[in-house]
């Protein structure tokens, strides 16, 4: 188990190739593994952890807040995508998938997920959650790009500055612990009115649409107005525990981006599934363990084998128990006429 976990950590957490990981094991541990032996070890580990991965998937649908994102990922020469769904304590990574709504439905079924979905404005996320938060980092980047690409147009700079001011006011309200729920709603209404005024004042006329960058500017205004109408711009004000960006999911992708940029993506669909299982477990262990070390992982995983129940399956059972209705004996007695 120790060898398999060490090998998997080198490959999936440090983004080394299997050959590089074998070379390190040989150098530091005097352990020689053939390529086929390394492949068998990783396959065996993924098989052992499949039930834990399934528990992570089920818990994601029960989370109160989920941050999500997707990025390009090749399987052999086929263009696919990698997805990340992350909550406070758990992460599900999927590799070699399509970029469509079916992936979101698989992880966050409409009839199960009642939490807040934090995402960019990609089409599959629109009108998808009962409560949503669009990523302000993506929106601000678009405004920054306009401002820097067309410095000769002062309107773009002024628009960005006012948009940033409104966002910062929202962040200030988010952190204001003195506000009651009623106070937050009142402040939110004022902030939304201010935002509507901003969008109205900067609405492009036909002449401005024809100017350099005018189409992108008009598209950004339209996107902002739609997100406001969908009540997905300032959810973080009403729910201070929610971040205003999905940067947490983007950070989770750093190892994946490094592997992709060095052409170490998946060679087969089976390899993509193996990476999905092992990477999800490692990332979720990092979120739950005080310190992620080989010793702490081994202690946790050997405990799974000894007790027959993993940390994640135990957490899932607790969530299931918490969501069960109380038995009839614990329900309040009906009032007598």
Predicted regions and their residues:
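Catalytic center-proximal scaffold of phosphoryl-transfer enzymes
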Residues: 1-337
């Amino acid at each position: 188990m120790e060898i398999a976990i060490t090998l998997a950590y080198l490959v999936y957490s440090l983004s080394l190739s299997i050959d590089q990981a074998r070379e390190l094991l040989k150098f530091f541990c005097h352990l020689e593994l053939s390529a086929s032996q390394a492949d068998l070890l990783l396959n065996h580990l993924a098989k052992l952890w499949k039930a834990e991965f399934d528990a992570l998937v089920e818990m994601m649908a029960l989370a109160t807040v989920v941050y999500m994102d997707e990025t390009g990922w090749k399987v052999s020469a086929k263009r696919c995508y990698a997805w990340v769904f992350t909550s406070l304590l758990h992460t599900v990574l999927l590799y070699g998938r399509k970029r469509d709504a079916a992936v979101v439905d698989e992880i966050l079924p409409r009839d199960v997920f009642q939490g807040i979905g934090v995402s960019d404005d990609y089409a599959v996320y629109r009108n998808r959650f009962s409560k949503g938060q669009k990523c302000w980092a993506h929106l601000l980047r678009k405004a920054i790009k306009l401002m820097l690409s067309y410095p000769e147009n002062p309107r773009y700079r002024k628009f960005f500055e006012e948009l940033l001011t409104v966002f910062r006011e929202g962040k200030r309200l988010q952190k204001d612990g003195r506000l009651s729920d009623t106070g937050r709603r009142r402040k939110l209404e004022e902030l939304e009115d201010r935002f509507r005024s901003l969008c109205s004042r900067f609405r492009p006329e036909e002449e401005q649409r024809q100017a350099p960058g005018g189409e992108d500017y008009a598209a950004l205004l339209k996107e902002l107005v739609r997100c406001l109408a969908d009540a997905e711009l300032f959810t973080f004000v009403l729910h201070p525990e929610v971040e205003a960006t999905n940067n947490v999911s983007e950070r989770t992708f750093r190892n994946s981006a490094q592997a992709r940029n060095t052409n170490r993506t998946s060679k087969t669909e089976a390899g993509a599934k193996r990476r999905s299982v092992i990477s999800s477990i490692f990332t979720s262990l990092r979120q739950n363990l005080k310190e992620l070390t080989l010793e702490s992982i081994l202690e946790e995983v050997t405990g799974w084998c000894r007790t027959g129940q993993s940390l994640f399956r135990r957490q899932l059972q607790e969530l299931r128990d918490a969501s069960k209705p109380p038995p009839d004996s614990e329900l309040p007695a009906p009032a007598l006429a």
